Every structure is written in structure tokens, then in C-alpha cells.
Amino acid sequence: MAMMTMIDVLERKDWENPVVSNWNRLPMHTPMDLLEKQSLNGLWNFDHFSRISDVPKNWLELTESKTEIIVPSNWQIEFKDKSDVPIYTNVTYPIPIQPPYVPEANPVGAYSRYFDITKEWLESGHVHLTFEGVGSAFHFWLNGEYGGYSEDSRLPAEFDISNLAKEGQNCLKVLVFRWSKVTYFEDQDMWRMSGIFRSVNLQWLPDNYLLDFSIKTDLDEDLDFANVKLQAYAKNIDDACLEFKLYDDEQLIGECHGFDAEIGVVNPKLWSDEIPYLYRLELTLMDRSGAVFHKETKKIGIRKIAIEKGQLKINGKALLVRGVNKHEFTPEHGYVVSEEVMIKDIKLMKEHNFNAVRCSHYPNDSRWYELCDEYGLYVMDEANIETHGMTPMNRLTNDPTYLPLMSERVTRMVMRDRNHPSIIIWSLGNESGYGSNHQALYDWCKSFDSSRPVHYEGGDDASRGATDATDIICPMYARVDSPSINAPYSLKTWMGVAGENRPLILCEYAHDMGNSLGGFGKYWQAFREIDRLQGGFIWDWVDQGLLKDGNYAYGGDFGDKPNDRQFSLNGLVFPNRQAKPALREAKYWQQYYQFELEKTPLGQVFAFTVTNEYLFRSTDNEKLCYQLINGLEVLWENELILNMPAGGSMRIDLSELPIDGTDNLFLNIQVKTIEKCNLLESDFEVAHQQFVLQEKINFTDRIDSNEEITLFEDEELLTVRSAKQKFIFNKSNGNLSRWLDEKGNEKLLHELSEQFTRAPLDNDIGVSEVEHIDPNAWLERWKGIGFYELKTLLKTMIIQATENEVIISVQTDYEAKGKIAFSTIREYHIFRNGELLLKVDFKRNIEFPEPARIGLSLQLAEKAENVTYFGLGPDENYPDRRGASLFGQWNLRITDMTTPYIFPSENGLRMETRELNYDRLKVRAMGQSFAFNLSPYSQNQLAKKGHWHLLEEEAGTWLNIDGFHMGVGGDDSWSPSVAQEYLLTKGNYHYEVSFKLT
């Protein structure tokens, strides 16, 4: 093959041949870390060609390129060509569906670089070249000679180049194809990009070297004795022997010799996410005299994974998966993720009570698994197989032609990663239907590695996450107690299926697209109540927003077609890893400490209990802080060191609490770290709870005034003068159109009007696919019925004046396409002290869809820096996403009152507000609390602009006050997912608020 010309190689079209996955690639093995390496990362010469036929026939002889490119990278980011851009699509293939064939217009990245090899390397052993990740397929040549070919963008490709390399300078050339037959198997929900995006390195190996080794840790039933079993393979084994040593820290605890050996460990320290204890294994390949050929060390964890009595168990304890799906993604570099970012992700996950990650939907960089071993995260390792855009979805996965291709993707993943204790589940891929190939791969996994369960969901209605090719029922987006588009069975229905006793772990749930994650707590209530419901993996970790001109881009922003718009933005964190409010909501529901308040039959509080949900960790670094507050100040507080075993509880006496029955009273509880430990800083809050002991809306006595209250009226306006202020009403619609303070300054830039819509959330918009509109989506229903174009019909405006107040009663109908959708009666009470009390009675036509909100909107003239309110905070919160929020008085910057979702929408709401103070304006709840948001952007602008960075700051500040607001939903983002109890279904509503200048 080395004698073949480049044209000969390219004319074979290996990238379209179903039975060719590589040429000359070495078998996969566990990574070898101690052999001498030379990195080839850095600047490479680079040429871009629009199609393979454009590559010059003499390219191998060319010594210059048009440009340079950083390796690792995606060339669509580094090399900007409008004909070859990042493409974001969820399901739809980016190329016509004609497997195994790809378009003739197939962009090519032509890479080349020079490197030196020493004489010692060539004379004393072997030289291997490894590409850790290249997409989607590539050929390479060294010094003009053909080297090899490989596919599978997410696993290493290693080649022995000893016969091609030479002493001194060597020239490496690589042709990378954007599309290949494997494009049909890599149809994941992500940006489609290409290039050499993981490291490239050279490795020197002696003549005698370790080819591979496998470590298994078998524990007895009592978990007090482990056999650490080693099976190793070496080059030239006849001339070598293997020494095997096991260390606990620096203490040697066992050693043996042989390529198939084992060491017994008494009372082993077990690995788990909570206590990720690692032993050090040392392997030494030597000759008979003891001269060392090859030495490797590997950190190993001793642990046991099993499914027993319908539950997935780790070291004998039933696991509750606090998981998240994670793509390899950074906004600056696409698929390239540095170790620094990996550690940052793990730190954030640990801080927010995550214990598991699904590598969606492909094997990650090897370093990721090492870090998960070290810091403690359970991993579902997933094969790089997804055929979501196929019809039927199993068109390829049920075709035996593609079994070898699929087999390599599963078996090579397992062979590389099998020695990591963090990996507790193998996954056969994602959303590829269910075919005979899956069953073959499942059978292979179970025969090769019986120590781990196998997962496969399937993605189509027929499989529902419960085929014979999975040990775990693993539906997507199943709801707790009702069916959904993706999951005909609810979680509770699954628990009643006759003859079914597998554990259920949601491979994807709680789709966090934009302002989402509503109803998340309902899942966790079910997980804690039902033993076989063992958690799940949220979709997903990070917004896939690529940087373009300094701003975050989503599908279509590069002119990419097809595209699925902002469906790439589903993360709990923004692309820069800044937390969204939903992340803190997830932290709250997943927290490892649960609290229960104890009361007498008469309702008197006398104690609370804290329970430790850790399976293995005693509380050795936690303190309990608890306070009695009235929302404004701390009335009483205490702190103690927590002392609980794993799974234990502790009761805290509260009989001495100073409760007098006259004020708002809240019991705030926090669990904090004492010392810095395993990425968590000292004094870091790991759990919190607030109990409302007494709840009162305090009505401050209205301060009377000697000021005369007067009334002026003409054909268009009604003016009330009170406390030297003017309240001017528009008689055509009954709205407060102007408000002048005692100095004549305008307080309003836009009239106080009623509001029933919101800038649509992604969950309101619905489906991901651009070309398809779902008539059941909330936005389509609201638009279709005319809610965004309501016609205001003033029915009556009645004015009553007394010595102390003016009452203006306004009856209004709101017409949608010729029918009355809503009717309201607004009763304005203006008192002599300048206070405006507004009482609103709302009635809806129940034949119409429920509104998003029932409230008010006004544009204040003020633009203050800070806001103070008494209500739920500090983050935004909504009726179905408020678990993490606390009652209290919050003093925040106005910039903290908005959440900058990349795709703008309704945001920043604060629920259960009793009082709001902004500049001179005081808004008080009367009878019940209200919700509000303050923003420099109107709902109208938020609805119209497609990107946050395109929003234009408006004059003053927009204030929205809601008596009632529907939930945000989040079970999924393509079907209406707001639970019934969070919809505004009633026919009548009433709320009251008071406005006053201070």
C-alpha cells in the first residue's frame, strides 16, 4: 500500500465504503502514559478545498500552504470560509440521505507539518503516531509515503510509523474529510464541525513493550476482601516477564508476577463518587535479569457495580443518579476542551450536587475520565453512534452491513476506557432505533465485561428505552405521572408493568432550554419515594453557543442550512460556564441533606430533623447553621458541627425559639463545608432549606394627609391631584397614562396597562425544527387566538369622589378576533397621601387558551442602580421553579434582575413579593403577594429580538407586576409541558397592589 499514489488512495473512496473503517490502524488499548512522547500540537500548515477533486495531484510534493491553523481545533472556527461553516442541526442530517454516499462537494482540510525524530528513537524501538480525535475521516502520509486511514471522530487512531519515519526532519501530511459514511452514524444534537480537534502526538516504544492491560476488582459479598486481577499483553512476551505492584498511597500492599495475576486486598478502601479513593498500580515489563523494558502506573479504584432486586447498586448501596448530559464544547474552540475547562465543569457539578455524567453522545477525551476517577463522578460512557435522522431510525442499525462499523465504535470504546472506576455503565449509543446490531453489541458487552450494566434507549416509539439491549429502563423525557410525546409510559406507569423489574434511570429529562426546568422538583419527589426510580440525566450541561464577532451564535447565524435555530441552547450553564438560575434549582432538589420540621398537634414548632443522603460519607467536614429571621433581620441563630453517619439523621431541638406570633418568621437552615475539600471551598453552602413559620402581609396604616384631593376632567383625560402629585387617566381605555410627582416630573414613560402575554419562552415556542410549526405550542395558540393583538374595549368608567379619596372604576373587555377573551374591572383608589391602590377583578372566557400572565405593565421614568424587595430571591423564580428560592428582603443591582438568555424571552420574575422599592416608588401587596420583574427591555422587544446582544436598552425601566403567572415548564421543550396546577385555568382572579412615592 505504501507504493500507492495519493490519487490511487483517493480513488478508492474509503470514506464511502461500508466495510472499510481503517487502514493500518493499531488495535485499541488502555492509554499508556509513561512512555516518552512528543506533542505535535501547535501551528500546522493548512489548505482548505471545497471538494476532494480540488486537492492538487501533487499536493504531497508541495511545501507551502496558504495559511496556518492551530491543532487541535475545528477548521470552521479557525479558518473562516462562508462555503464551509459550522452547522447546527438536531435531527436533520446536514447532507442528503444516501448512505454510504456523501456529496461530491465534500470540504477537505489539508494539514501538514514538520517534526524531528532522533536517531535514538529509530534505532532502539518503535515510533507510534496517535490522532486523539479527527472528524470525520482522514488519510495521512509521512515523508510522501502512505501511512493509513481512520474513522470515528471521538476515539484515538494509532499507527506504527517506524518504517516511514527517518532521522531528523519528517513531513506529515493529513487529508481530513468533512463528510464520510460515518456522518450517518454521528448525527448527534450538536454543531457539525470537522478537523483535527484533539491532540496529536508521537510516542516512542521499546522493542519489548506493553500492548494492553486490563484491571478488574472483584469484591466479595461483604465487601471486605477484593481480588485485583490483572491481565496484560506485551510485544515479544517470550523474552519478558511482568511485575505487578499495588500501592496504597506510598505503602506497598501487594505484588505478584505474570501476565495473568491477582492481588488480594483485605478491607479495601472502596471507590465512589463520594470518596473517590484510588490505589496506584505499578506494572514493570523486564527481561529475565531485571532490566526494565517498559514501566506504567495506573490509578485504580476498587468498587462493585451490580443490579440487585431491581436497583442499580454501587458497593451494595442503591444509587440515586444526580446526572447531567454533557457535550464536549467551548464557545471559543468548539469541540476542543482544555483540562482547565474540564476541571471547572467538574467543580461546578460537584458544587451543585451532581454525581453522574452521561458522555452524550460519544466517548470523551481520555483526560476527562481520569479527572472523574480523581474527583469522583459516575460516568455513562457512550459509543459514538446516532442515526436520529434516518427513517426508520433503525434503517442502518438493523442492517448487518454496518455491524462491523458499529462494533468497532463500541468495542474500541470499551477497550480504551475499561480500567476507569468512574465508568459504571456502557451505552451503545443514542437515538438509533433498535436493530439486530444493537443486540449483538449488547451481547458482546455482557460477555466481555460482566461487571458493568449496559444502557441503550433507542429514541423511537417502539423501544421506549426498554429493549432487550439494555439492563436499565432508560426513557427520554418521560413525565412522572402522565404520558408524553417521547414516552407513552409515565414513570409511575413503568413501575406497574407486569414482569418488569429493571431499574429506571432517565437517560434524558428536564430539558433546560432557555428559561426552563419548571416542575423539576416533582421528579425528585418521585425518585425519593419509589425505589426503582433511580434518577436521571438532565439535558444538558452547557449552552452550545459559539462565539461569533464576540457574541454567542446559534443555528442559522453562520448561514448554515439546515439548522435548528436556538435548540443548541439547552444548558444549565451559559457557554462561558456562568450558572443559570436553573442550575441552582437543580442543586436544591438534588442536595444530599433533607430537612423535616416537627410540630405539635397545635402547630407549634419544636424541632427539625436533618437526614444525610450520602451512601458512604459520614459528615466529617460539615457544619449546620440555622437562623430565625423575620425577613429583615436575624432574630436568633445557632451553629453546630454535623455528626451523622451515611444515611443517618440528626434531630435539632427548637423549643427555645423566640416565636411571638406577630411577625413574618422564617427558619433558614444551611449546611456548609468547614475546610476546603475535593474542589469545594471552605464555608461553601452544600444544602439549604427555609421553613415558613409565620407568614403575614403587614398592612402599614395609611398615613393621612391634610392635602386636598381634587379632580379635573375633560373629554379625553381625567386628572386627580393628591399630595401635590397628578394622576392622569386616559378616558379612552381607563389606563393611568401619566403620573407627575410634586415637582412636576414624569414618573411614567408608558402608561400603566394590563398585560396577559409574555415574551415567549422556548418552551412556549415548542418544536425545534425550523420548517415545522406545532399548533399545540403555547405561542401558536396565543398567536392564533389573537392574544398578542388584543383590542381594548372600554365598557364603563365610573368616578366617585369623597373627602379622603377618589375611586375610579373601569370595566374593560379585551377582544380577540371578534370574541371577548378577557374582562376586567379595575378599581383605582387615590388617597390624600398620594397613594394609589389598584384592585383588579379578572374574568376569562374559558373557551380560550389560558393566558401567560394576569398583570400590569408600566414603563417607569427612573433608571436606578439598585432595587430592594421583600419576596422570593435572590434568583429569578417562577411558580413551578421556586424550590431554591428564599423569602427575605433582597437588595440587588438592577443588572441582577435580568437573566441574559442568549435567545431573549420573559425572564427575571420574582414571586411572592410583599413590597418593592425602586428609586422613590414603593409597590406593596394588599391581601396577597404579587410577582414582578424589572428590566431595561420591554416584553415587546424581548419577543422580537433573536439575540440578547441585539437588545437595545430603552429609556427608564420596564416594570411588570403580575397577580398571577403561569409556570415555565421543562419536562421537554417541544410539547406543552407546564403542569396543570401551574396554568391559569380558573375563570376568575383577583389581586390588589398599592403604588406610592416615598
Swiss-Prot record:
Enzyme class: hydrolase
UniProt-recorded Gene Ontology molecular function terms: beta-galactosidase activity; carbohydrate binding
Effect seen on changing residue 677 to Y: In strain: ATCC 7962
Record annotation: effect of changing residue 182 to G: In strain: ATCC 7962
Effect of residue 237 to M: In strain: ATCC 7962
Highest taxon of source: Bacteria
Family annotation (PROSITE patterns): GLYCOSYL_HYDROL_F2_1, GLYCOSYL_HYDROL_F2_2
Pfam families (alphabetical): Bgal_small_N (PF02929), Glyco_hydro_2 (PF00703), Glyco_hydro_2_C (PF02836), Glyco_hydro_2_N (PF02837), LacZ_4 (PF16353)
Catalysed reactions listed for this entry: Hydrolysis of terminal non-reducing beta-D-galactose residues in beta-D-galactosides
GO-annotated biological processes: lactose catabolic process
GO cellular component: beta-galactosidase complex
Keyword tRNA-binding listed: no
Keyword Hydrolase in record: yes
E.C. number(s) listed in UniProt: 3.2.1.23
Keyword terms, alphabetized: Glycosidase, Hydrolase
Catalytic site: 431, 508
NCBIfam families found in the cross-reference section: PRK09525.1
Protein family: Belongs to the glycosyl hydrolase 2 family.
Protein name (database record): Beta-galactosidase
Species per Swiss-Prot/TrEMBL record: Lactococcus lactis subsp. lactis (strain IL1403)
Lineage summary: Bacteria, Bacillati, Bacillota, Bacilli, Lactobacillales
Gene name tied to this protein: lacZ
